[in-house]
Amino acid sequence: STVARVTDGSLFFHPLTAISGVANIGDDTNWCGHPFAQANWYAFGRLAWKHSLSSEQIGEEWLKQTFLPVTGAQTDTPAGEVIQKEQIDAQLSLLNSQVLQKSREAVVDYMMPLGLHHIFAWGHHYGPEPWCDIPDARPDWLPPYYHRADNMGIGFDRSSTGSNATGQYHSPLCEQLDNVNTCPENLLLWFHHVPWNHQMKSGRTLWAELCYAYDRGVNEVRNFQKVWDRMEPYIDSERFRDVQHRLKIQARDAVWWRDACLLYFQQFSRQSIPYELERPIHELKDMMEYKLDITNFECPPYGFSK
């Protein structure tokens, strides 16, 4: 069944139901630090009450309630031109389709695509550290335990020939996940240790597909910057500059993630990054030596940059 049928009471015929969640709130005035992180809280609340809503509907609701001027208020550009509500609606629609609806997959692509997982930095988890090796730490706290990269391939074998985590699922999902050729590619490296030259649905090798995914994530974030800059005439300057600044940090961090992961895993694949893709701009040695001096409860003003 689904979580939705539990929360609406239809699965177990309960007249009263509840749902709880965990999120990254802090002591900032807006709770979440990043203005757009509030959209996740809003989505959670809306789905708790009406699970049939689509992500597009929720995104549209949140954007209009967050950025539309108060009813009756006049919105002017710096040049004194009056902006019509239809103009703002069109820009919010673009923001919804090109940023809100794509933001999750963009982050997955430039951080941990194709089912990679737990390859972030020790402790605070900000930034990439697939090479992390802490003396005397539990193996399952360290990235190499999860990515299992070697000269043969990459990924954690949770199939019936490995830890058999796939056996926890009912048929036919069990069989689908257990087969490297039918396992959804966004989960592939979670369930399988896959050879670097394994052919993907795109026709590319696994190594090339990994490179394309990281590159796609970086370019998506750069597009977020372009879409957001279109919003300048339509919202207050304080929030515009705040989000613009945060997107600059995200764009730099995306390149940091891409370069760190591809250069590190390239040591095992021993293959070139496809020549049509953007070249790394950082040195692996520099990134491996870099340490962020932050706790688990704060975000840095910037990530790696050298």
Residue ranges and their predicted role:
Residues 2-69, 84-305:
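Catalytic domains of carbohydrate-active enzymes that cleave complex glycans
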